[in-house]
Design a protein with these regions (language model features):
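Conserved, single-site charged/polar hotspot
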Residues: 1-505
Length: 505
């Protein structure tokens, strides 16, 4: 009789448990993590498609966030504030990390207390909002006939939540995605108070996934596969040796998941882990659009000590076929004067002289002679290029490999003789009736021996003829394309542009 009672007791107890499922949520880790700055703004709106762990970096409090939730991040004084229906504040910022291995989760119709046991009068361990979730473990019906769910919180605690305010969902999202603006990204994010009054948004992900969002933005996916693979190797080496990364040309153009292409993804996967090394150590590599027929020595364009970079030397680019190989831009004297800090209204440009000290003729300084005296500007390739503003092409000259042809189209009679100069705009002239006037129009009428001719008062009389587009250090993208089309393999392409190196995992 006693045996029968005991068996009946255990049978009744087992009926209380409706479902039991083993589960173990884990934050996704990356073998080669990188962080890419996506934004630095007063506020950012971010949508999370997938399950993410949300951590306050100030106090290490953690929670799981509801899939497809939108968070709004902003600054309040020294703090980062994140609003997801509920507000969170931290002076250190927040981390949002991908979570693996959650098959089912509990979400809530309103704020719900997590209890120590399956009873409403038991200890409250936490309270979760509608924006938060917990990992589902199992369910039971208590002695009052109430259904409760056993759940696991992000901080590792287990507890019970009532079915009356809880819904159990299957996790159907295989690839968690972060959306910022119109672009989507793999991985997680950091929301940091790095800049005063702004929230810095970093995308944290694995290096190989990062490259999938770089290559199609740096090289057309339609180009030869060996060129794409060379680009993947060089981009990987650059990123692996960079202290910080941005999603612009300041580092490498990174468009995220929304810009990935099957062809460039294959190039990344087929070169996985391969980098450029010198003396057995990975090096930081560089690339650009067009060399113009020869790449540059790093010491000729970045004022670096060439002896420290024996792999960043000038090499021929025999198969480069680019629309940017040769170019020409013309400028007015007023444009040049403004770039050098002079007022064209009261300063006359007399001459412009480039100093080409690079092995191929790269210009490292420019001197102008003016009525206010001479001025020389010396600097690396970006300093020189920005002296000559142009439409498009990032707003400045394509490279610092150029020559200058200056045509002084005016001969002006002064009290001291004749001067040859580029322009007469803003200058005083003596008229036939003996009065003096200032030239203010864009054109001037000039009496010649045979007729009156009209000329621009400030013509585009200074012409720069140059080659290449970019800093020209390391790999030319158009050059890599040409080599690939002529039978070169990716590793040999990379070794061509980075002399004295090995290319391997």
């Amino acid at each position: 009789m006693t045996r029968k009672v005991i068996l009946t007791f255990f049978l009744s107890l087992s009926l209380l448990f409706i479902h039991n499922e083993a589960s173990a949520a884990t934050v996704k880790s990356y073998s080669n993590p990188v962080a890419v700055q996506l934004a630095d703004a007063a506020s950012s709106s971010i949508k999370l498609q997938g399950i993410y762990e949300f951590t306050n970096k100030g106090n290490n409090e953690k929670t799981f966030l509801l899939p497809n939730i939108t968070m709004n991040a902003s600054r309040s004084g020294q703090n980062v504030v994140v609003n997801i229906g509920t507000s969170f504040t931290s002076s250190a910022g927040f981390e949002v990390k991908e979570v693996d291995n959650i098959a089912k989760y509990a979400k809530f119709t309103n704020a719900t207390s997590v209890k120590a046991s399956a009873a409403s009068d038991s200890e409250t361990r936490a309270t979760l909002s509608k924006a938060e979730i917990a990992e589902y473990i199992e369910s039971l019906v208590n002695d009052k006939g109430e259904t409760w769910y056993n759940v696991l919180l992000a901080n590792g605690q287990k507890g019970w939540v009532p079915a009356k305010t809880t819904l159990i969902e299957n996790n159907s999202i295989s690839t968690p995605i972060v959306t910022i603006g119109k672009k989507t990204y793999r991985g997680g994010i950091s929301l940091l108070p790095k800049t005063s009054g702004k929230v810095t948004v970093l995308n944290n992900l694995d290096l190989e996934d990062y490259l999938k969002g770089v290559i199609p933005n740096e090289m057309p996916a339609s180009w030869h596969k060996e060129a794409l693979k060379a680009q993947a190797i060089v981009a990987r080496s650059y990123a692996a040796n960079s202290m910080s990364l941005k999603n612009t040309t300041a580092s490498q153009v990174y468009g995220g998941y929304s810009t990935e292409d099957k062809r460039t993804t294959e190039a990344v996967e087929e070169t996985a882990g391969i980098v450029v090394k010198h003396n057995g150590k990975p090096i930081q590599t560089f690339f650009y659009s067009t060399s113009g027929g020869k790449t540059a020595n790093v010491g000729d364009v970045w004022n670096s000590n060439q002896a420290n970079f024996p792999y960043l030397i000038s090499v021929d680019d025999p198969y480069e076929n680019s629309p940017h190989s040769n170019w020409e831009n013309s400028f007015t004297s007023s444009t040049i004067l403004k770039s050098f800090g002079f007022n064209p209204g009261n300063t006359v440009l007399y001459d412009i002289k480039p100093k080409a000290t690079g092995a191929n003729g790269e210009v490292t300084s420019i001197t102008i002679e003016t009525s206010a005296g001479p001025k020389t500007i010396t600097g690396n390739e970006s300093v020189i290029r920005k002296l000559f503003p142009i439409e498009g092409f990032y707003g400045f000259l394509k490279s610092n490999w150029f020559t200058v042809e200056a045509n002084k189209s005016y001969t002006v009679q002064t009290n001291n003789g004749q001067n040859s100069q580029f322009a007469v705009s803003g200058q005083a002239v003596m008229q036939g009736n003996g009065t003096q006037s200032t030239i203010s129009d864009n054109q001037v009428a000039i009496q010649t021996a045979n007729s009156i001719v009209t000329k621009d008062t400030d013509p585009t009389s200074i012409t720069l003829t140059g080659k290449g587009w970019g800093h020209r250090i390391g790999m030319s993208q158009y050059g890599a394309k040409g080599l690939a089309e002529n039978g070169w393999k990716a590793i040999n392409i990379v070794k061509h542009y980075f002399a004295n190196t090995e290319v391997s995992k």
